[in-house]
Amino acid sequence: MIDIALLRNDPDLVRENIRRKYQDHRQPLVDQALELDKLNREAILRADTLRAQRNSLSKEIGGLMQKGKKEEAEAIKQQVRDLQQELADLETKESEYEAGLREVMLQIPQIMDPSVPLGRDDSENVEMQRFGEPLVPDYEIPYHVDIMERLKGIDLDAARKTSGSGFYYLKGDIARLHSAVLSYARDFMIDRGFTYYIPPFMIRSEVVTGVMSFAEMENMMYKIEGEDLNLIGTSEHSMIGKFIDTILDADELPQTLTSYSPCFRKEVGAHGIEERGVYRIHQFEKQEMVVVCRPEDSMMWYEKLWQNTVDFFRTLDIPVRTLACCTGDLADLKVISCDVEAWSPRQQKYFEVGSCSNLGDAQARRLQIRARDEEGRRFIPHTLNNTVVAPPRMLIAYLENNLQEDGSVLIAKALQPYMGGRERIG
């Protein structure tokens, strides 16, 4: 949610930002917000005037009563009652204007960083950098489910019976490898100075609207029937929600957090759920990183966060690249974002395994997260998030890049302590 002062002072900037996102259907929101803001400020000004009149008349009534002028006092009392009624009506209007303004403001996208490349959708995202040499094997790399089945590590048929499409049973060495990756990711981030959390896996609707756009809510979130609770789509949701209605002191910034959670997603939209695979599913586990920092530091942290993910994958010898998300692919709350993609030897192309985002003050403004500098002045901090690793999607890249011609899979040195010292499976 953008600052209302920005909208008042530079509405053309807001309109241009909407145009760059190819969301011209949202242009009317700017005028709607300006009109509601005008009406609300007029109502506040009128209410302040009425309160001053009421207070003045109330003092006058006291003086008249002391002088025994009851009839004059009664006439003024009626004026006060009339003012009270008008004031009550105005306060009702104020509440309506404020609620309407907030609803409109929540739909206006965050102002993007000028460096975000122009583009309509993810097909126009721009490659930033590549890390590692892509593997081109001289033997066939099977589909990831086939690799897992040969290693007796997955049961999709049983999952379909219990839960439907988009779920899986992992077992044996594959389940152990899955856990090893997450344990290594936890320790990797702790070693980089991040505080480890296991957060709540359900959050209230107030937090949901604070951390994501309406479109993301509809496409992602599962709501618990009969409860004001929603299953999280990523631990970022509950980790940012942790600071709702909080004022952080200067010495508490930056907050550098890493969190583990299962993630639950409806995956409504163009891509949908795979019938036979673990790339796009309803339930998975993830290690996340979250930062709350001073506004002037957020771009520095943005660079650090995506580099953490690149470094993590490179310790596992998985080639990766980073892609700058274009304006049309950027979610409404994001200032700038990039995807981290891993190399698929089977497909001979990269595929997404994580996403790093700087959300500026959008989430903090929605959730009333504030900070106080050394002089006691308040400001709104910035929030960022990034995927460390999200198996089983990451396992697709790992298995393909470490599959041997004999069907076994090498265990990277970094993972061997979490796999009982084993050097390969299969």
Predicted regions, residues:
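N-terminal alpha-helical targeting/anchoring segments
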Residues: 1-134, 149, 153
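TRNA-recognition modules of translation machinery and tRNA-sensing kinases, especially anticodon-binding
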Residues: 130-426
